[in-house]
C-alpha cells in the first residue's frame, strides 16, 4: 500500500473516531445537568420513567435468571418475547446492559444514550463520507444528524 493511500485511510479512520467522539461527548454535556440534579439517574417524563427504565431493569434480571420464556410478573403472565421484543430484544443497546448488574441498569441510561448518539454520528459519517466533498463536511453532517432535534427529542423513545 502506498504512502498516499495509507494517509487517506488514516484520515478516514480519524473521521470515524471524530464523529463518534464528538457526538458522544455532546450527548454527555446534554445530559450532564440531569445527572447532577438527579444524582446519577436520568429522569425524563411519561413513559420513559414508567416503562423504559422498569422494562430495562426487569428484563435485565429476567434474561439472566429466568428458566424459560414465560413472565409471571407481566400482567397476568405472558410470553416475555411477545411482550418485550418491541421494546428491548431487538436493541443491541439492551443486550449491552445485560453485562451490568441489574441494580446498575437505571444508572446506565446516560452512558447508553452517549453510546447511541455516538453510533448515530458514526453511522451518519459512514453514509456521508461517500457523498461529501471532504472528511470535515462528513463529520459536520454526522454531528448535525446525530444532534438534530429529531434525535434529541426521540430520546423519549428509548427503544429506537
Where are these regions (language model features)?
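Start-transfer (signal-anchor) and selected internal transmembrane alpha helices
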Residues: 1-35
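Membrane-water interface of alpha-helical transmembrane segments
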Residues: 10-17, 103-106, 110-113, 132-135
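Short hydrophobic "helix-edge" motifs at membrane interfaces and signal-peptide entry regions
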Residues: 13, 76-77, 137-139
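Hydrophobic alpha-helical transmembrane segments
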Residues: 17-21, 111, 139-143
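Functionally constrained cores in energy, signaling, and assembly domains
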Residues: 19, 116, 121-124, 130-131
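Residue-level detector of functional hotspots within protein domains
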Residues: 20, 42, 135
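Membrane-interface coil-to-helix junctions
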Residues: 26-121, 143-160
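Transmembrane-helix signature of polytopic, membrane-embedded enzymes
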Residues: 125-147
Amino acid at each position: 500500500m502506498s504512502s498516499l493511500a495509507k494517509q487517506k485511510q488514516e484520515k478516514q479512520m480519524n473521521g470515524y473516531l471524530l464523529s463518534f467522539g464528538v457526538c458522544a461527548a455532546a450527548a454527555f454535556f446534554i445530559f450532564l445537568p440531569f445527572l447532577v440534579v438527579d444524582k446519577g439517574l436520568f429522569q425524563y417524563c411519561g413513559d420513559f420513567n414508567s416503562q423504559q427504565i422498569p422494562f430495562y431493569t426487569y428484563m435485565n434480571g429476567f434474561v439472566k435468571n429466568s428458566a424459560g420464556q414465560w413472565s409471571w410478573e407481566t400482567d397476568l403472565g405472558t410470553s416475555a418475547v411477545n411482550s418485550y421484543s418491541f421494546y428491548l430484544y431487538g436493541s443491541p443497546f439492551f443486550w449491552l446492559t445485560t453485562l451490568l448488574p441489574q441494580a446498575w441498569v437505571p444508572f446506565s441510561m446516560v452512558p447508553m444514550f452517549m453510546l447511541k448518539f455516538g453510533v448515530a454520528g458514526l453511522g451518519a459519517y459512514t453514509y456521508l463520507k461517500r457523498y461529501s466533498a471532504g472528511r470535515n463536511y462528513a463529520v459536520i453532517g454526522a454531528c448535525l444528524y446525530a444532534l438534530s432535534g429529531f434525535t434529541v427529542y426521540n430520546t423519549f423513545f428509548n427503544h429506537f
